[in-house]
Design a protein with these regions (language model features):
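Hydrophobic faces of well-ordered beta-strands that scaffold small-molecule active sites
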Residues: 4-8, 48-51, 75-78, 101-105, ...
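Divalent metal-dependent hydrolysis catalytic cores, especially in the metallo-beta-lactamase
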Residues: 22-29, 34-57, 73-81, 101-105, ...
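Short, acidic/polar
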Residues: 30-39, 84-95, 173-174
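Catalytic pocket-lining loop regions of alpha/beta-barrel enzymes
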Residues: 115-224
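Conserved, mostly hydrophobic/aromatic
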Residues: 7, 40, 63, 94, ...
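Mid-to-C-terminal alpha-helical segments outside catalytic/metal-binding sites
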Residues: 1-4, 29-47, 212-213, 218-224, ...
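Active-site gating/metal-coordination segments in enzymes
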Residues: 57-142, 149, 190-197, 201
Length: 274
């Protein structure tokens, strides 16, 4: 069984060579690809989906170089710029020249006064459908209705909701709305960023009911586990971050665990030797 981390970031330790976005705090945590590979080797992790980090903004140079250097280890998800004259132009270049297979859609970057399910969202979803790119949503529960509208208009677009959709334990109505998105057959959910979603300490077992609700609604074949490196290193450590699933879903069958810990993301992105 291959273990694939379905969501993480990498950023350069050389801001002179790969500039950070203005306003990035001084002394940010180490997040380079070589550090990640060391941790993955120790944890028995075979590869990862890299999501373009906000520290580099829309400058994908560092992730481009990482993808080129380690093509068997990593797949890239680009960050869409919804304020660009044509948000799809840069994405097309990243796909064609650097092999990106996904697009992160972050409503927090939308122009003021515009909704994610407006014209820009339509353009991005249509583009993903036409190119085969996977659309990943970094959202909160207040955005579930907009995601539902987009997926209803573009049912052929493969989609992912990151980080449980920011649903926390005890948010029964928000969880109900998240589970309702299972009506879209090509929708997936990342069970990720546990230290932020949880209200308890490692191993964050208060997320168990949420995950089992997702399994019942989506099936484990549409769920994927992720650590959210490098943030997880300071939160609980990479190796312990990878062990979370064994504690919050101890009743998983071997087959279900194969899907959750790598099978789903391997199938969705047709990568890592799938």
């Amino acid at each position: 069984m291959k273990q694939i981390d379905a969501h993480l970031h990498v950023w350069s330790g050389d801001p002179a060579g790969y500039p950070y976005l203005p306003g990035t705090p001084d002394g940010i945590a180490r997040g380079d690809a070589e550090f990640l590979l060391e941790l993955q080797a120790d944890a028995g992790v075979d590869g990862a989906l890299i999501v373009q980090p906000i520290h580099h903004g829309f400058d994908h140079s560092y992730v481009n170089d990482v993808l080129e250097k380690y093509p068997d280890k990593f797949v890239g998800m680009a960050l869409a710029d919804p304020a660009a004259d044509d948000p799809t132009a840069a994405l097309q270049v990243l796909k064609d020249q650097h092999g990106y297979q996904g697009v992160r859609i972050n409503p927090g970057l939308w122009p003021a006064g515009q909704s994610m399910d407006g014209p820009i969202g339509d353009q991005l979803m249509s583009f993903c459908a036409e190119t085969g790119l996977v659309a990943g949503f970094l959202i909160e529960p207040s955005h579930f209705g907009q995601v539902n509208a987009l997926c209803s208009r573009y049912p052929e677009t493969r989609t992912i909701i990151d980080h449980f959709g920011s649903v926390k334990p005890g948010q029964t109505q928000e969880l109900k709305e998240l589970l309702a998105l299972a009506r879209h057959p090509k929708m997936h959910v990342k069970v990720s960023r546990f230290p932020v979603s949880s209200e308890s300490e490692w191993p964050y077992t208060d997320m168990s009911d949420t995950i089992h609700g997702l399994i019942d609604a989506f099936g484990v074949e549409r769920l994927m586990f992720a650590t959210d490196f490098p943030h997880v290193v300071a939160q609980c450590g990479y190796a312990r971050g990878w062990q979370i699933a064994d504690h919050v879903t101890p009743s998983l069958t071997d087959e279900q665990r194969v899907w959750l810990m790598g099978g789903t993301v391997m199938k969705l992105f047709n990568a890592w030797g799938n």
